[in-house]
Amino acid sequence: VGTGPFRLTQFTAELVRLESHDYYHLRHPLLKAVEYWITPPLFEKDLGTSCQHPVQITIGKPEDLPLVSQVSSGISLGFCYLTLRKSSRLTLWQARKVITIIHQSGLLQTLEVGENLITASNALLPGWTIPQWEVPDEVKLPETLTLAYHLPVELHAMAEQLRTTLAAEGCELKIIFHHAKNWDDTTPLAQADLMMGDRLIGEAPEYTLEQWLRCDPLWPHVFTASTYAHLHSTLDAVQLMPDEENRHNALKAVFTQLMDNATLTPLFNYHYRISAPPGVNGVRLTPRGWFEFTEAWLPTPSQ
């Protein structure tokens, strides 16, 4: 926020206000300002919105709510994910079994979250598909595993469903909840075998994922020190490739290996929806999952 035709003028827990630049050098938006009020109690009962992950946005005033209808929708590139740390407690095939259970048991389709809020992931990014394995019958899960996870709130349902599902496989899942939107130094990640969170994706998906591997405090707890150092060396080599397509293909290979090694799997993406009362025009959702207001316009107020 702060680039393009709008600049950020106010940012609080309840309000984000954008105003158009007076001297923007390209096409000017039709609206002078856009205010985004974060008011989950206003919509939560009827629309099922999550105050931690606002996937439903309604344009208008509270008195307009009975009149609103959907004007734009899409599926996020961002995703909630599961990472797995292999060790003497969790082998490669045991980790693959956990992932197979998640994606093939119907677990993701039966989560107790809002209707049409999420869709089960089949790829990390479009074309970066999740691998599938034939897990040998003799592979049994450990007696206990520990899961750490943070917000959004939809992961509460995921954690409980996973605990129930793994219990049917003879595995007790101990759960640690980190009440924040990101990992930090206070998270007991060193105790966890499994870790869940979410990864927002911006206008440059490949760059976002590359920086995620480099910078998120999660990864030093997923890999051994030597493996993580080797990963950084691989990312350095990828970054030096002069051709963009080659860089993207090389980064895809890195993440494909992480998924095949049962280190990472996406869980689900979000359905984003914009609703508005009659007369609100031109608001759309971009292919990247961003809300576009530059062509939005309102009719002249009635006298």
Predicted regions: what they are:
Residues 1-38, 43:
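Gly/Pro-rich hinge or "lid" segments in bacterial periplasmic/extracellular proteins
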Residues 91-168:
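Append "and occasionally in soluble cytosolic enzymes with long acidic Gly/Pro-rich linkers
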